[in-house]
């Protein structure tokens, strides 16, 4: 910390305490120590490490912020790593606690390495890192080209900055199957409505929405209205038989339309342009 301060005295210094995974294979180490230790013991084993820091970072330990603030009332905390699926709960803690200044997810953009830590398998168990041909981590709100993934649109709702509802469609070929997702992953969904040969087959649609209620329409026909917004973790869930055409989500407040978004089945290709 002293070295950093000599070179840059203006900005705060942070470092992270990391909760090891339950199956961590580290000799002589209780993998759940940092997460499950009682408050006084945790304070004793971490106090010297955290003392020089301006901001104490915790990785994957949201349950410790409130209890450790009681023991260290003058500390400033930050969630230095969190899992994508925990974004709603994690951000609610930032909004609730003034001593918790932010939440960082692992990770903003996908990357090469730690192959498959964010993968999802269908009707198969997940075990460790993925083998070749996996190369990407498979996590990240943005893909390697910088394009937003569904989880990024969900986070927009959590942050209160979403401009419209997002239609997260589970491909109908996955209906009734179990998606096994790592803690860094996200279910297989896409804002897409083109499944030839699946007409009449059931499909699940999750709408990411900040509104109190969300209505779903297929080809102008109301499928249903479901609660959404923060009390429902910003997700309105629907099931319907697939039919090509237009799928529309409408955000509602007090029964009045706020905004809408539509996805459409494309027509036949007309030509190729180079």
Predicted regions and their residues:
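Substrate-binding clefts and catalytic carboxylate motifs of secreted carbohydrate-active enzymes
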Residues: 2-7, 11-31, 38, 47-274
